[in-house]
Amino acid sequence: MSHLRIQCGKPIVVVLLFLCALASPLAAQSAPRTIHVFVALADNKHQGIVPVAATLGNGDDPVRNLYWGSAYGVKTYFARSVDWQLIASGQEPKAEILERCIFKHRTQNVYLIADAYQGSKIKQAIMDFLAAAAGSAPEKIPVEAKTSSTGSPTTLNAAGGADLVAYAGHDGLMDFQLSAFPQGKNGNTHQAIILACISKSYFASPLRATGATPLVWTTGLMAPEAYTLKSAIDGWILHESNDQIRERAAAAYDKYQKCGLKGARKLLVTGW
């Protein structure tokens, strides 16, 4: 009887080990990937931007703002996309943020959190973005069962806990300096997208301090509109290489700005 138990036990143990091995990647896959986008609303009064129409450049009005509620603003563009579903909006997690939107990808277990910062609070928007890039102050955001990818309640990792962080808006570092940079820890694996004018020059030092890697940023003047951001995110979701993601971003920018693909490739770059 003892001999039989040993012989039968071996396959049982093997089966259990095999099932455990399968369960580990499945459990990892069940955790949603998150993207946190920090948007500084365009503001004719408080930012050194080329003035735009008064309605588009009102930094206190996210609904009609150039970088948020307009056709190519982050909220409107993603809400109209066939790839994303807006599952929550209107939240104001802190005073500087006039609106928070949460989007769920329709086919992948990926969520996007987008925060619209009051135009006059652009410095805070940039500091919060850099802190997130450094992995600091992670935020937990609960998602209701009816709006989650799994059909059950889940919690999203945002800010310093997000998998990818992005900034979109005016390059405020052209107007002011930061007294200190958020410091990342060794082994920081965050990637960052910075859609702002000449961001590779102005954000280089603070981004190095965070330890994050620049996935897409810019070498010249640009329109930080959402089509470029979405195209880069599309590639990131598919686990494409940094160069492939940058190529997507450049192609999208050329499509809308008609600047020529060669010019878009010079403008939008990846890495240091």
Regions found by a protein language model. Give the residues of each.
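Functional beta-strand-loop-alpha-helix junction segments that form "active/interaction loops"
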Residues: 62-158
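Acidic/histidine-rich, surface-exposed loop or edge segments in extracytoplasmic proteins
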Residues: 31-61, 106-112
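Boundary at the C-terminal end of the N-terminal hydrophobic targeting segment
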Residues: 25-30
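Bacterial N-terminal signal peptides
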Residues: 12-23
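A polyampholytic, Gly/Pro-enriched intrinsically disordered region
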Residues: 216, 236-245
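Bacterial N-terminal signal peptides that target proteins for export
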Residues: 2-14
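Caspase-like cysteine protease fold
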Residues: 244-272
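Catalytic cores of nucleophile-dependent amide-cleaving enzymes
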Residues: 155-235
